[in-house]
Amino acid sequence: MKAWQRQFIEFAINKQVLKFGEFTLKSGRKSPYFFNAGLFNTGRDLALLGRFYAQALVDSGIDFDLVFGPAYKGIPIATTTVVALADHYDRDVPYCFNRKEAKDHGEGGTLVGSPLQGKIMLVDDVITAGTAIRESMEIIAAHRAKLAGVLISLDRQERGSGAISAIQEVERDYGCKVISIITLNELVAYLAEKPEMADSLIAVRAYRDEFGI
């Protein structure tokens, strides 16, 4: 685990974005941890979040031309990511996001920002069922652009209803790489370094043993 990944985990815990306990997921599973990126909700939070996304993008080595944020949660993530790329890596990358509803006045259409063209890096908070990715792929394909990759905050590394995860399904269906700032394995490694979090470590490991990929 890299130092910036450890810092991201601590950032998420401090902001109560990452919590430990017992949580019922939409799937009905009882999870010993919960990640709610919506609680990154101040200017300072977003500035720091953008730096982590930018760091993960640069480290990945994936070649891309534009950052796309699917509505709604992906919009501030895309914005803060390109600001961080400009401020910290001297990379002036265009960005774009979609509206859920098309406008029939002003600039019109469903897209806001730079033209959706070239190699697209899609950014979002998490992938649960992959629905937002599939909707975004329809938009990207309609503009004859190509999906270069997907970046999310946390890869839960757990099976969906079948034998593979929603992330693995996206990689299989669209032939792209899905990367994350942290994975469940890195979260387990972090907990193992913290004696005071031993109970959470036991619960998360048991969950990974049952549902992990």
Swiss-Prot record:
UniProt keyword list: Glycosyltransferase, Magnesium, Pyrimidine biosynthesis, Transferase
Catalytic activity: orotidine 5'-phosphate + diphosphate = orotate + 5-phospho-alpha-D-ribose 1-diphosphate
EC number: 2.4.2.10
BP-aspect Gene Ontology terms: 'de novo' pyrimidine nucleobase biosynthetic process; 'de novo' UMP biosynthetic process; pyrimidine ribonucleoside biosynthetic process
Cofactor: Mg(2+)
Enzyme class: transferase
Associated pathway: Pyrimidine metabolism; UMP biosynthesis via de novo pathway; UMP from orotate: step 1/2
List of residues binding orotate: F34, F35, T128, R156
Alphabetized PROSITE patterns for the sequence: PUR_PYR_PR_TRANSFER
Listed GO MF terms: magnesium ion binding; orotate phosphoribosyltransferase activity
UniProt xrefs under SUPFAM superfamilies: PRTase-like
Pfam family, any one: Pribosyltran
Binding site for 5-phospho-alpha-D-ribose 1-diphosphate: 26, 72-73, 99-100, 103, 105, 124-132
Keyword Endoplasmic reticulum found: no
Gene Ontology cellular component annotations, sorted alphabetically: cytoplasm
Function of the protein: Catalyzes the transfer of a ribosyl phosphate group from 5-phosphoribose 1-diphosphate to orotate, leading to the formation of orotidine monophosphate (OMP).
UniProt cross-references to NCBIfam families, sorted A to Z: pyrE
Family recorded in the similarity comment: Belongs to the purine/pyrimidine phosphoribosyltransferase family. PyrE subfamily.
PANTHER family, A to Z: OROTATE PHOSPHORIBOSYLTRANSFERASE 1-RELATED
Assembly and oligomerization: Homodimer.
Protein name: Orotate phosphoribosyltransferase
Gene designation: pyrE
